[in-house]
Amino acid sequence: MTTLSAKTLNLIPGQLTLAQLRAIHQQPVSLTLDSSANQQIDDSVACVERILAENRTAYGINTGFGLLASTRIASEDLENLQRSLVLSHAAGVGQPISDDLVRLIMVLKVNSLSRGFSGIRRVVIDALIALINAEVYPHIPLKGSVGASGDLAPLAHMSLVLLGEGKARHKGEWLNAVDALAVAGLKPLTLAAKEGLALLNGTQVSTAYALRGLFEGEDLFAAALTCGSLTVEAVLGSRSPFDARIHAARGQRGQIDAAACYRELLGESSGVSESHRNCDKVQDPYSLRCQPQVMGACLTQLRQAAEVLEVESNAVSDNPLVFAAENDVISGGNFHAEPVAMAADNLALAIAEIGSLSERRISLMMDKHMSQLPPFLVANGGVNSGFMIAQVTAAALASENKALAHPHSVDSLPTSANQEDHVSMAPAAGKRLWEMAENVRGILAVEWLAACQGLDLREGLKTSAKLEQARSLLRSKVPFYEKDRFFAPDIEAASQLLSSTCLNPLVPARLLPSL
């Protein structure tokens, strides 16, 4: 099996796990390709060479591309065809993709090409691996793909560097392609028949975008469970809605697992829960009581999207595909990123709901009648405004996400003179997840601050061991609010803590797919 130890990855094509993909996204990796891949790679190249020797016509090998597929290319022009393809398709715009995402894209591309269905030589695959290992990351603009026929423009920018064109970043410095190749011990390559198309065709950029959204969504989910539990304690909420019997009766797996996690976080009892054991409150508002139902549904969406993205991360999404055993090349549509687009749309729903529910809990804490805490969680109200506008900020972020959650997979614009007449919009579907995640991080930061403030206002009362850990983590960076002060730095400090995933260890690792 594919193994990942610290920063070393021995890749058996088609066997990457979500945990490995998360690690690749987080840190540089030293990549080796398992020798078991060599034979199928070589066989696919030999198949392409046979087709050329037999003077057979095969799309992408000795024809033009897209609407120009019926144009036969002379043998002496095949190398120029591949170079022209890469140069002409490198038409992206926007800011450069970050190094961590470029690294993930490149590993995904190596994984796909090494499956042996692409007719690309080992020397080209090895060059990509050498760039990864040298931490040389091609300049890839953020925008320019509609997710079918694959991620052509961004992958063309990735491939430019192999030809000695374009530029790449190494340890924060931009280098021209020739110098960047030299850092990795390489010289510019001349691509053979089919190789340019193999490099450009594929869903690796769309998949990497969505994977980042998945990883951030998982981290936010874990944080939201903890923040929501802290809020239950801060407003003297009931533990009864988390009773396992309720959730078993419904049978929704995500809900059952979420409820179990809330029970672990809250513990069987605490100083807070004992303080109101005999109160006359009958039911809590939905934002407290229905957390397992809402967050359980979000968990189900995260898990389903993760399953799709893990499959796609190991998929062959090239076109045409080389089936060496049958001496055949078949044109299909594996480049269409509709599965990725729909997975990203589902992630957007989950991320939006995580933030929406958190914002409602913040609002609850502001209301003295609902929370039994001072208005806006501060003494001497009127002179002090406390969390009043922090809640408004959370509301603004939650509202932004409602618009951003609109599905992208229902959109399509025909391209390539209507030859490519239905596209997935998967890159846009994945990319907007990052903004949504940043918004939710801000919302959860406010809730974490508010819940800890509420608990501190209940002087002398302790919550569960796990929730006290979360409380201490925050208080190590942000002190109690005695009176109004400049608020934005505190939200930023809490957001930075959330970005560090410091709350992930408080939930079971088994809960989320990539942890």
From Swiss-Prot:
The lineage of its organism: Bacteria, Pseudomonadati, Pseudomonadota, Gammaproteobacteria, Pseudomonadales. This is Histidine ammonia-lyase. It catalyses: L-histidine = trans-urocanate + NH4(+). The keyword Cytoplasm applies. There is a cross-link at residues 148-150 (5-imidazolinone (Ala-Gly)). It is an enzyme of class 4 (lyase). Pathway: Amino-acid degradation; L-histidine degradation into L-glutamate; N-formimidoyl-L-glutamate from L-histidine: step 1/3. The modification 2,3-didehydroalanine (Ser) is found at residue 149. GO terms for cellular component: cytoplasm. Its EC number is 4.3.1.3. InterPro entries: Aromatic_Lyase, Fumarase/histidase_N, HutH, L-Aspartase-like, Phe/His_NH3-lyase_AS. Keywords: Cytoplasm, Histidine metabolism, Lyase. GO terms for biological process: L-histidine catabolic process to glutamate and formamide; L-histidine catabolic process to glutamate and formate. Contains an active site 4-methylidene-imidazol-5-one (MIO), which is formed autocatalytically by cyclization and dehydration of residues Ala-Ser-Gly. Its main location: cytoplasm. It comes from the Bacteria. Pfam families: Lyase_aromatic (PF00221). One of its GO terms (molecular function) is histidine ammonia-lyase activity. It is found in: Cytoplasm. Belongs to the PAL/histidase family.
